[in-house]
A protein has these predicted regions:
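Conserved ATP-driven motor cores of ASCE-family P-loop NTPases powering translocation/secretion/packaging/pilus
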Residues: 91, 95-188
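P-loop NTPase motor domains
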Residues: 1-108, 112, 124, 165, ...
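Conserved small/polar residues in nucleotide/adenosyl-binding loops
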Residues: 192-194
Length: 194
């Protein structure tokens, strides 16, 4: 008796063809031109126009690569900018959350960045994204912009005094949270290091 149905095998072959020679080959069928893996940037902007299943596959490839570097190799820093891209997939959120919990044991760090806190407060992901704000030992919090004050304070676990420090937009000013300590930072660009 057959282990796989003919229909399933046909779907697999069509998927492989698409990834190797078809429409998705631009994402999956290429050789790297990166001679060193000391500093890598995966630009995900082009993925936004891909089909959801292709986008999810590519995001998981990136997550798997990052996870290996962070948790197996260690002594690595990974940054996920434009985090909203990952929030449409509950499995990706869980993957990121679990990675955040374990990276410090391997002398690694994970940076999460997003311009819009409201992306984390959507009904379908709210409970899953809440821990993303309580796990990191270091947080740099900037002015909330137009987001509701109470939502901002609740999501980031801020009291009134902490919120008031960053209530108004000020270039380079942020609240730095490190454990139970709080610092108001003013960040300046030093031309010496450029």
């Amino acid at each position: 008796h057959l282990l796989y149905t003919e229909k399933l095998l046909q779907e697999v072959l069509l998927g492989l063809h698409s990834m190797c020679k078809g429409a998705d080959a631009q994402f999956f069928n290429g050789h790297t031109n990166i001679p060193s893996s000391r500093f890598l940037v995966f630009g995900v902007k082009g993925m936004l126009s891909a089909a959801k299943n292709v986008r999810n596959a590519m995001l998981f490839n990136v997550l798997s690569f990052m996870s290996d570097k962070l948790l197996t190799v260690g002594n690595t820093v990974a940054a996920l900018d434009e985090l909203y891209i990952w929030l449409s997939n509950p499995t990706a959120i869980e993957y990121i959350r679990n990675c955040l919990k374990r990276v410090r044991k391997k002398e690694s760090a994970m940076l999460l960045a997003s311009q819009n806190l409201e992306d984390f407060d959507q009904e379908q992901v709210r409970e899953m994204t809440k821990p993303l704000f309580s796990i990191p030992p270091h947080q740099f919090l900037f002015n909330a912009g137009s987001i509701d004050k109470r939502s901002y304070m609740e999501m980031l676990q801020l009291d009134e005094a902490e919120y008031n420090l960053i209530k108004f937009p000020q270039r380079g000013v942020c609240l730095y949270k490190c454990g139970n300590e709080r610092y108001l930072l003013e960040v300046h660009l030093s031309l010496i290091h450029i």
